[in-house]
Design a protein with these regions (language model features):
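Helix-loop boundary and gating motifs at the non-cytosolic
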Residues: 1-55
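Intracellular juxtamembrane helix-capping segments at the cytosolic ends
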Residues: 30, 123-141
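Interfacial helix-cap and linker-helix signal at transmembrane-aqueous boundaries
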Residues: 34-35, 65-69, 97, 170-175
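Central cavity-lining transmembrane alpha-helices of secondary-active solute carriers
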Residues: 44-67, 80, 164
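C-terminal ends and interior cores of transmembrane alpha-helices
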Residues: 75-108
């Protein structure tokens, strides 16, 4: 692996901005979108609450992120997976009828693919959180870790403003006024959310492309299994997993 270093200002702001976007898409935008599409609260409540589960249970698989591959690999791989999920969410957006939306009785079954893609995004995002936070500790000196803690927090909050403010505004404006140059008429709720997810997919894909080249490759970023252990196969992996799991719960 070629070791590279980068000015932290080049990648920390965008890394933590990217960390927040999928979290707010899955836990906030999904609920608002389904409600606007006319899905009854009782039907969507269970499914959308389950989408938060990956962040609750991520300690159970975080040891695998330490054991297998580098933190950088996990960051880029999960961002690529989430970019693909956002693209698929845009392309597979269901379009319930105006009557279904108005009746507030849109069947949640037509959103099966959408919910699966949100679930994939949730697991990828939780895994990305593990890798990004670990990478932050590896790639920066103790001094820089302290210096940039406010920066990472600020850009995570900016992603909240983007996810819960800018994207919601785009959907609301498009629904109210339409966008004639895109063929979206006023009142077309499904198209307004399709556009919103399309904007998300575009921005997140560009950030992912940027990170592919800019995120550094520090010498300290390596799997816990060295080459000899990796040749030992699954036994060594699960041995390391057990050690990591035990360490986590004894802290």
């Amino acid at each position: 692996m070629k070791v590279t270093t980068r000015n932290p200002w080049l990648w920390i702001p965008t890394l933590y901005f990217a960390e927040g976007i999928p979290y707010f898409i899955v836990n906030n935008i999904s609920v608002l979108m389904l409600a606007k599409m006319g899905v009854p609260n009782g039907m969507m409540g269970l499914f959308t609450s389950l989408l938060y589960l990956p962040w609750m249970i991520k300690p159970f698989w975080s040891p695998f992120v330490d054991i297998i591959r580098t933190k950088r690999w996990w960051i880029i791989a999960m961002q690529l997976l989430m970019s693909l999920a956002f693209i698929m969410l845009t392309l597979c957006m269901p379009h319930p009828s105006v009557a279904e939306i108005a009746s507030r009785n849109t069947p949640i079954g037509i959103f099966d693919v959408t919910l699966i893609l949100f679930a994939i995004t949730a697991f990828a995002s939780a895994t990305h959180d593990i890798a990004a936070d670990g990478f932050y500790m590896l790639a920066l000196s103790t001094k820089n870790q302290a210096a940039f803690v406010g920066i990472r927090s600020t850009f995570y909050r900016l992603s909240s403003i983007f996810g819960q403010g800018v994207l919601v505004y785009i959907a609301g404006y498009t629904e109210t006024h339409g966008l004639g140059f895109l063929g979206i008429e006023a009142g077309d709720i499904p198209a307004s959310w399709q556009l919103t997810l399309g904007v998300t997919a575009l921005i997140f894909s560009l950030v992912t492309l940027y990170h592919t080249f800019i995120v550094p490759r520090p010498a300290t970023d390596h799997p816990r299994l060295d080459t000899n252990h990796r040749k030992a196969g699954a036994g060594a992996i699960f041995h390391e997993f057990a050690n990591s799991f035990a360490t986590f719960f004894t802290k």
